[in-house]
């Protein structure tokens, strides 16, 4: 099973705001989202993430370079997976249910909870509005032809409404991270932990990897 370790982000840095959080995550190990089992042709984006935590919540930063970019959806729980989208799914303890968090390049969120793809409950808009985001998007580079965008996220523990969490130190969680873009000119479906499935599908908790919170 693929796994990595998440370090503690000092509270005083977190309290300085999203730019300080983003800078801290730049110093953490970068995990690559580069498994593309359903890719036959075209260009693949370059995607990485860094993850940290503390007694306030979970901190996550994505970095993306891709040929095409869409960021059309602006309302919480819109179908952002049709845009340029990054995602992470997480299950706590032995729970067979998991949360799915999906964001387009401007930070619009689609999030749910359930046991499988067809058993999702949208998280309340008021709850999702408490997720802090910092998005930076650079126009298409004249030399490489690629868009560069980054998304930094802070998930307070209160977002995980079906669990009572105050600290994840010395705990492990099942997890996977993804990049997709269903309606891009060249659709793609990438994951951090490998997936074995005949067609693109992210809702496969049995194939999640593992994060160890130090």
Residue locations for each model-derived region?
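Structural preference for beta-rich elements and adjacent junctions enriched in aromatics
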Residues: 1-214
């Amino acid at each position: 099973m693929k796994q990595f370790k998440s370090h503690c982000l000092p509270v005083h840095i977190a309290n300085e705001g999203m730019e300080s959080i983003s800078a801290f995550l730049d110093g953490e190990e970068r995990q690559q989202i580069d498994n593309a089992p359903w890719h036959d042709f075209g260009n693949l984006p370059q995607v990485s993430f860094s993850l940290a935590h503390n007694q306030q919540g979970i901190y996550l930063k994505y970095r993306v370079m891709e040929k095409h970019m869409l960021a059309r959806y602006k309302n919480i729980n819109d179908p952002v997976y049709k845009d340029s989208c990054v995602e992470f799914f997480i299950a706590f303890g032995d729970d067979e249910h998991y949360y799915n968090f999906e964001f387009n390049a401007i930070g619009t969120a689609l999030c749910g909870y359930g046991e499988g793809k067809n058993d999702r409950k949208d998280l309340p808009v008021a709850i999702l509005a408490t997720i802090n985001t910092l998005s930076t998007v650079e126009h298409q580079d004249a030399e490489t032809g690629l868009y560069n965008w980054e998304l930094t996220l802070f998930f307070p523990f209160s977002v995980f409404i079906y669990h009572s969490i105050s600290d994840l130190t010395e705990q492990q969680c099942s997890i996977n991270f993804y990049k997709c873009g269903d309606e891009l000119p060249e659709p793609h479906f990438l994951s951090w932990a490998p997936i074995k499935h005949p067609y693109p599908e992210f809702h496969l908790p049995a194939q999640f990897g593992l994060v160890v919170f130090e």
